[in-house]
């Protein structure tokens, strides 16, 4: 924990500047003390390296420029801020399309300021920075470059994740004074089981019994939609074995480990669809499902993917994506209320008022509706439900909002009633929601009192720390917890000081190795994983072969027979690779380009390689202009490209170059660090290893596995021969990169330039 807090201190000391535009005051949230403003902030290209807040982070902002009023100069610093969902992200049409990609902040600016004479006076200082395009509808605004301001971020070094993880552990281990305050018996048995996977005491649960449609989805009486049934029938043997294993789940815990391209998330989605989309007899509500991923973007992707599946199936499922329940619970301050309330009291009564009023205010400032193809957040869903039912079910709340809109001040009792009405609204919305996608940290604590899922999926479970895994086990008692992931690709992130980093103030963490071992990895280590998915349906052109041999004991196999691995588009790229390879035969669509005159260049603590950079961009633009380069999934579309590299400086350089390309090319191109590439794929992948004197950190098996399993049709690796060796050791060879080099050399697929 020290290292994570230290990094936040480093970010604070660095005082990195971010471009922002001051849009409009949020009039319905003005109090006697603060006037909230909506900011739109341009995210940096490398979010991780820059320390850019998410909706669950705690921070303040400083404006770089000062404001002069009445002969005095004022500094707008240490101003509390919250990242909120961008109100224009989900709008179908906006005038300035850049806005949809920006982050939105609610910034609570003080109304009272001290002048040079020591007097407290009311000033609206932030209006000095407000953009000139002051449309009543936010979707009509346009951001002028010369009107941008600069801000810096001051992080709260305390971690909400750390608190949530330890609270979950204490929930299991501390003696409870009240019997109903602790975990259920089923949760306790699951907790004991993950301490010893082969313990003798096990209760077995049968999901096929709980959901009869699982036993035979094709029976007409279950009325499973064709779109879901068609996908179910396409299950391979591995998928079917995992599906049948749901008949005997030990203590409700089920682990499914899957290789790249094996359809892990798809398997989850089809199972969820079978449970929720079949015909329901004598049931008004569908069986609720909680879908957890510990990465916010993956949360959004999962919600969108399930929504698309249900849309295709013609079934109306109420789906919500949720970021940041802990902030809503602990940090949405009781507006105009007493601050003397104990932590226990504020914990017991979640206060949604602040978020709801933000959403309400912003909704009234946009004339276009939310894009129906984008899953709403919890706050958006609550506002939309209120709008549909305000005259019937929420008349009291409507009267209070009308009172606020008229400019009339609310009394203390009014604010209490407002919080009560909003809390009831959120309870109603959560009670009628069928599917919630969120992070484990957002699901911690009192959320379990509002939403009681029958099934919990934890996708990318091998990426979650063991303490994170405890959160769904501690607070929920579903029929089953289903964990899916790939222990060969990902592991939890734990910041630890390597030798080269000790000067930066980071400390050696003696528990780092233990913290990097996920619950799923431990289960795999003792052969306690229930099912394995080892059929790769992503890779064509024999791209599956090498990672299978290196990382999966040659058990990962292609989902296609030999005749089907080279459809026309893949065969076209084989010819392209052969042209790079001096017209030598290429037996699989992977080559290494060894640029002997290239050199790495260091920028701060990161690297890039200018010669690699130029060559990759030249080849990428060549392919993007080639009509023969087609998408594998849709031959009518041009193929896609991923440029992956281990180093943030190299990513920044590629991003800058790609931004100058035509918009149509940019839409077909991704630039990612290798660590961010997990879960992404492209038709052609350029993997720029950058380094020329050492293997760097690419000799890590999980990182390398991710790197060489992203391509669907072809993979081009820029790598120097020196990366196959360990510097300073005579004849010493890197463990994994040497295998990559030797295999490619053996098959005559190394191109030396």
Q: Which functions belong to the PLM regions below?
A:
Residues 40, 60-62, 106-108, 124, ...:
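Beta-strand cores of modular interaction/reader domains in eukaryotic scaffold and signaling proteins
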Residues 1-245, 331-399, 511-513:
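Pre-ATPase regulatory/linker segments immediately N-terminal to the P-loop/RecA-like helicase/translocase core
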Residues 203, 207-210, 286-289, 317-320, ...:
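Residue-level recognition of the N-termini of beta-strands and the immediately preceding loop/turn
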Residues 230-231, 251-274, 395-409, 584-622:
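Glycine-rich phosphate-binding "P-loop"
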Residues 441-458, 462-753:
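Conserved helicase motor core of SF1/SF2 NTP-dependent helicases
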Residues 229-336, 417-552, 737-746:
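ASCE P-loop NTPase helicase motor core
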Residues 108-111, 295-297, 647-648:
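Loop/turn elements at beta-strand to alpha-helix junctions within RNA-recognition modules
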Residues 352-453:
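Conserved helicase NTPase catalytic core signature
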């Amino acid at each position: 924990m020290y290292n994570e807090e230290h990094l936040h201190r480093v970010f604070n000391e660095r005082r990195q500047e971010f471009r922002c535009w001051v849009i409009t005051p949020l009039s319905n949230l003005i109090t006697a003390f603060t006037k909230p403003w909506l900011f739109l902030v341009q995210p940096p290209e490398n979010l991780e390296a820059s320390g850019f807040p998410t909706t669950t982070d705690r921070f303040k902002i400083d404006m770089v420029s000062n404001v002069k009023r009445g002969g005095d100069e004022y500094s707008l610093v240490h101003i509390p801020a919250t990242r909120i969902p961008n109100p224009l992200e989900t709008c179908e049409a906006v005038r300035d399309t850049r806005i949809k990609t920006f982050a939105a902040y609610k910034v609570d600016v003080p109304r009272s300021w001290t002048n040079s004479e020591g007097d407290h006076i009311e000033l609206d200082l932030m209006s000095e920075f407000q953009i000139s395009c002051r449309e009543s509808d936010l979707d009509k605004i346009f951001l002028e470059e010369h009107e941008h301001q600069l801000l810096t971020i001051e992080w709260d070094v305390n971690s909400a994740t750390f608190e949530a993880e330890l609270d979950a552990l204490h929930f299991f281990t501390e003696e409870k004074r009240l019997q109903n305050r602790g975990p259920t018996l089923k949760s306790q048995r699951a907790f004991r089981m993950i301490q010893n996977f082969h313990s003798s005491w096990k209760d077995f649960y049968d999901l096929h019994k709980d959901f009869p449609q699982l036993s035979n989805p094709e029976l007409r009486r279950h009325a499973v939609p064709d779109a879901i049934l068609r996908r179910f029938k396409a299950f391979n043997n591995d998928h079917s074995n995992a599906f049948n294993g749901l008949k005997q789940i030990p203590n409700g815990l089920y682990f499914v480990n899957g290789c790249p391209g094996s359809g892990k998330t798809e398997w989850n989605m089809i199972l969820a669809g079978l449970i929720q989309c079949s015909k329901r007899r004598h049931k008004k509500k569908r069986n609720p499902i909680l879908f957890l991923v510990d990465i916010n973007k993956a949360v959004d992707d999962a919600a969108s993917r399930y929504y698309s599946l249900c849309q295709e199936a013609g079934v109306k499922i109420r789906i919500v994506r949720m970021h940041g329940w802990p902030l809503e619970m602990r940090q949405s301050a009781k507006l105009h209320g007493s601050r003397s309330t104990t932590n226990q009291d504020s914990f017991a009564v979640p206060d949604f008022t602040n978020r709801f009023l933000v959403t309400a205010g912003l909704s009234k400032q946009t004339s276009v509706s939310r894009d129906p193809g984008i899953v709403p957040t919890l706050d958006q869903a609550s506002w939309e439900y209120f709008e549909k039912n305000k005259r019937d079910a929420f008349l009291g709340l409507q009267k209070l909002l009308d009172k606020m809109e008229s400019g009339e001040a609310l009394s203390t009792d009014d604010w209490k009633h407002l919080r009560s009405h909003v809390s009831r609204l959120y309870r109603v919305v959560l009670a009628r929601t069928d599917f919630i996608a969120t992070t484990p940290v957002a699901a911690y604590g009192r959320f379990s009192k509002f939403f009681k899922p029958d099934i919990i999926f934890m996708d990318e479970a091998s990426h979650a720390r063991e303490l994170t895994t405890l959160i769904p086990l501690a607070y929920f008692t579903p029929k089953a917890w289903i964990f899916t992931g790939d222990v060969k690709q990902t592991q939890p992130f734990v910041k630890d000081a390597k030798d080269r980093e000790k000067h930066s103030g980071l400390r050696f963490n003696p528990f780092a190795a233990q913290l990097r071992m996920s619950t799923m990895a431990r289960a795999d280590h003792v052969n306690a994983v229930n099912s394995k998915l080892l059929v790769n349906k992503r890779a064509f052109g024999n791209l599956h072969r090498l990672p299978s041999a290196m990382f999966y004991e040659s058990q990962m196999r292609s989902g296609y027979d030999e005749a089907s691995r080279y459809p026309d588009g893949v065969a076209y790229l084989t010819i392209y690779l052969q042209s790079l390879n001096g017209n030598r035969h290429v037996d699989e669509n992977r080559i290494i380009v060894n640029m002997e005159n290239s050199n790495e260049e260091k920028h701060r603590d990161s690297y890039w390689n200018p010669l690699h950079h130029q060559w990759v961009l030249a080849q990428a633009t060549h392919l993007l202009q080639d009509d023969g380069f087609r998408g594998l999934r849709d031959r009518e579309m041009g193929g896609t490209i991923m440029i992956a590299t281990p180093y943030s400086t190299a990513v920044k350089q590629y991003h800058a170059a790609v931004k100058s390309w035509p918009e149509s090319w940019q839409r077909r191109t991704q630039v990612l660090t290798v660590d961010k590439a997990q879960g992404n794929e492209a038709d052609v992948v350029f993997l720029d290893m950058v380094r020329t004197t050492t293997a760097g950190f690419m000799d890590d098996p999980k990182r390398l596995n991710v790197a060489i399993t992203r391509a669907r049709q072809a993979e081009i690796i820029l790598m120097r021969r020196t990366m196959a060796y360990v510097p300073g050791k005579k004849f010493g060879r890197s463990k994994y990169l040497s295998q990559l080099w030797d295999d490619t050399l053996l098959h005559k697929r190394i191109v030396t330039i």
